[in-house]
Structures are given as structure tokens and as C-alpha cells.
Amino acid sequence: MATRLLCYTVLCLLGARILNSKVIQTPRYLVKGQGQKAKMRCIPEKGHPVVFWYQQNKNNEFKFLINFQNQEVLQQIDMTEKRFSAECPSNSPCSLEIQSSEAGDSALYLCASSLFGTSDYTFGSGTRLLVIGKA
């Protein structure tokens, strides 16, 4: 009984952290057919000029995709054969877009923001992308 109560308490606290996240990601879930475009958005914490996008696969491995500072790209990977694109315009949500989704793109996509880009990252709740069948 005590173990069950502890589990419920932890789940409630984790849920509260997600609900109170200062980084807002939409949509929470995204289901696309192969070949379809997938777009996710992120509103960074107010006053945070540095924004990161990560991909977390089914093995819980994190892959850095891109980061911005004041709307300018600082670092990025090859953006997966140019199928991925991202932008972070001033006064608008940042976005990550996959032009032609593939099954291997199914993952949790996380946006994080930071004041300086070196520590104290604030993560959003993520967008879970599932790519199925044919478009």
C-alpha cells in the first residue's frame, strides 16, 4: 500500500512539473504516414534567447539536432539528409519540421531553452511523433 501511494505521489509531482513547464511544446502527440510532413512548435521560456531541439529514440538515446541564439543558428547536425528544417523567428514559436517522414523518425522530440546555453536548461514536455504505413 505504501509503495502504491509513493508511486501515485511521484506521478502527480511529475505531472505537475510538465503542466508548469515554462517551455511549451505543441502538439503533444503527432501521428503521420510515411512521406507526410510533420511540424512541431516550441515557445521557449520568457527571456531565454537560446533554444535547442533534441530527438530521443525508443532506446532513450538523445540526439542533438540544432540550437539557436537570438534567432540565429549556432550549431546543427546535417539535419538528416536535409529532410529536417528548423527556425526560431522573433516573436513567434520556434518550429521543427520534417519534410518527408520516415518510420525511423518516430521518436520524442524535445525543445529546451536556456539563458546562456551552457547550463540550467528548461525542457518542454515533448512531442511524440509516430510515423506509420504509407502516406
Swiss-Prot record:
SMART domains attached to this UniProt entry: IG
InterPro entries per UniProt: Ig-like_dom, Ig-like_dom_sf, Ig-like_fold, Ig_sub, Ig_V-set, TCR_beta_variable
Pfam families hit by this protein: V-set (PF07686)
Region (D segment): 116-118
Signal peptide start-end: 1-20
GO biological process: adaptive immune response; cell surface receptor signaling pathway
GO CC, alphabetical: plasma membrane; T cell receptor complex
Chain positions covered by the region annotation J segment: 119-135
Region (V segment): 21-115
Alphabetic keyword roster: Adaptive immunity, Disulfide bond, Immunity, Immunoglobulin domain, Receptor, Signal, T cell receptor
Disulfide bond residue pairs: 42-111
Note: This T-cell clone expresses only a single V-beta chain segment although it has three rearrangements in the beta chain family.
PANTHER family per UniProt: NON-FUNCTIONAL T CELL RECEPTOR BETA VARIABLE 23-1-RELATED (PTHR23268:SF82), T-CELL RECEPTOR BETA CHAIN (PTHR23268)
Protein name: T-cell receptor beta chain V region 3H.25
The organism of origin for this protein: Mus musculus
Organism placement in taxonomy: Eukaryota, Metazoa, Chordata, Craniata, Vertebrata
